[in-house]
Amino acid sequence: MAQQMPSPEEIAAQLQMIRDQIAELQGVLAQLELRLRSVQAAKETVEKAAGQDGETLFPGDPELNTILKARLLEPGKAIVHLGLNVYAKLDTAKATEILAKKEDALKRSLETLKQELDKLSRTHDQYLQLLQALTAGQAAQQAGQQQKQGS
């Protein structure tokens, strides 16, 4: 039994679903990239604080709109978010290690999602080509029928 070719309307609907998935995935990627930059900035701050004693300057935000002059109350210590709203005061080496693991996990997640986005983009392109071929074929068929009727 021959498989019936999907209609242009069905392919267009599939294309829209793929576009929606691509847009959603791009949003998730943007959020993960923001989280990655945040973790990287936190790691850099902890690394900088590790060797400081007394007053030092710290960035107030990633874009350096503000720089804060601060005195470390406990040099060599950092309070790090462990997840689920749990924080721990750790030595800076352990804090840096935890942040590095978070950074690696985010990078792996980003890579996986980018691969998925590439796959979806290729699928989108294939569906688009199929839709264009079908609509071109239908247009040619209609033109042929009109010529027959005109003769």
UniProtKB/Swiss-Prot annotation:
Subunit structure: Heterohexamer of two alpha and four beta subunits.
Similarity comment: Belongs to the prefoldin subunit alpha family.
Keyword Chaperone applies: yes
Pfam families: Prefoldin
Organismal lineage: Archaea, Thermoproteota, Thermoprotei, Desulfurococcales, Desulfurococcaceae
GO molecular function: unfolded protein binding
GO cellular component: cytoplasm; prefoldin complex
One GO biological process term: protein folding
Subcellular location: Cytoplasm
Matching Gene3D superfamilies: 1.10.287.370
Principal location listed in the UniProt entry: cytoplasm
SUPFAM superfamilies in UniProt: Prefoldin (SSF46579)
CDD domains assigned to the protein according to its UniProt record, in alphabetical order: Prefoldin_alpha
Disulphide linkage map: none
Function: Molecular chaperone capable of stabilizing a range of proteins. Seems to fulfill an ATP-independent, HSP70-like function in archaeal de novo protein folding.
HAMAP family: PfdA (MF_00308)
Protein's name according to its UniProt entry: Prefoldin subunit alpha
Keyword terms: Chaperone, Cytoplasm
